[in-house]
Amino acid sequence: MFYELNIRAGYGKEESENMAEEAFEIYFKGRNTVTFYEGVIETFELLKNDYSLGVVTNGNADLKVIGIDNLFDYIFSAADLNAHKPDPVMFEAVIQKTGLEAKEICHIGDHPINDVKASLEFGMTPIWFNDEKVDFPLEGIQVNEFSDWHSLPDLIKKL
């Protein structure tokens, strides 16, 4: 897209290619510059001792570049699966790869529809990361929630 905009703006083919590559590098670097919530890394390290951990993401950040891929046994991205949450394809991939039943899986996420409702409808146990400490916006759904990453291991043990 950036390449085509440069061509339309009157830049030559080679210059447009170079500018598009440079723009993508800047975007990729920015997309993989992450500030973690307090306690999130320590919590994943602790959970990894007792559970198999995976990521189901619509995002395009590279966990290896970020430096946290070692915390997860499975990574399911929308780009790899050609689907986005709440599409059941995302959750079916988890079942297929892990060999677990849906009822054995806790899905932790911050989006009421894409994470909580979708995983619940698939038969998983959703846990809502409610960092803004607001009421759950969807009626008729009882959901386990947390706002402090340090509290997550105890919440999971209670389920």
Please provide the spans of the model-predicted regions:
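A metal-dependent, Asp-based hydrolase signature
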Residues: 1-24
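Alpha-helix C-capping/helix-to-loop hinge sites
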Residues: 5-9, 30, 78-79
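Asp-based, Mg2+/Mn2+-dependent phosphohydrolase catalytic module
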Residues: 14-17, 41, 45-46, 51-159
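Surface-exposed cleft-lining segments at the edges of enzyme active sites
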Residues: 25-34
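Active-site core of PLP-dependent enzymes with the aminotransferase class I/II
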Residues: 37-38
